[in-house]
Amino acid sequence: MTQVFYFSGAGHSKAVAEYLADRLHCTAAEMSSAESTPVDLAVAVFPVYCQNLPPVVKTFLKGLQAEWLALAATYGGFSPGNVLQEAASLTAAKVIAGVILPTGHSFLGEDTAFDAQAFIPFLDNLSSRKEITLPKGAKNPFSDFFPALRSRVGLKILKSDACNHCGICTTRCPMAAMKNGVPTGNCIRCLRCVSLCPQKALSIRAGKALRHYLNGKRSSRVYLYV
């Protein structure tokens, strides 16, 4: 049995997961709500946050029951760090393929389009059932210092009077960090709340340092390991 699992905040990784599930003729399940049932091949799709794995992804991989694993990470054009090797280290499953794909950046409000052609060799290799060794990616030594806190300091989530207290942001937050449109200290700035709000009552405001960073040079490199 093959199953695609994903974590997605603003929708970029969800779009990739749904594409892969369609190509593999299986379903795509959210990591935060997926049952821990054994599968033969798991395809894990997730975003890179501050060169790190989101907490939801770490928790999921630690409990994953799969013989084989393929990893697909999305990043917004800045450094993806060492996320594939770090993800592989959290599970006993044998990794047979890995890819890091540039997509739109959630902090910039960019759409979920991606280059599907980049997945052709990734998909072709899933039938091999041959374990690979992932290389260590370059990672800023300071990226592990409170990444969620740095995101919260650099990016504010604002609530307008359009909020009608529907509670969607509260119930759909993967970190249980939203209370009536106001983020708590558990927020990782995945921006799922902003993307799902039916009233468009939530918006973001980046600080000066983050705006400078987001205006920097971006990469369109695809990292492929098969």
Regions found by a protein language model. Give the residues of each.
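FMN-binding flavodoxin-like domain, especially the glycine-rich phosphate-binding loop
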Residues: 2-3, 10-16, 22-152, 205-208, ...
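A generic structural signal for alpha-helix starts
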Residues: 8-11, 78, 164, 188
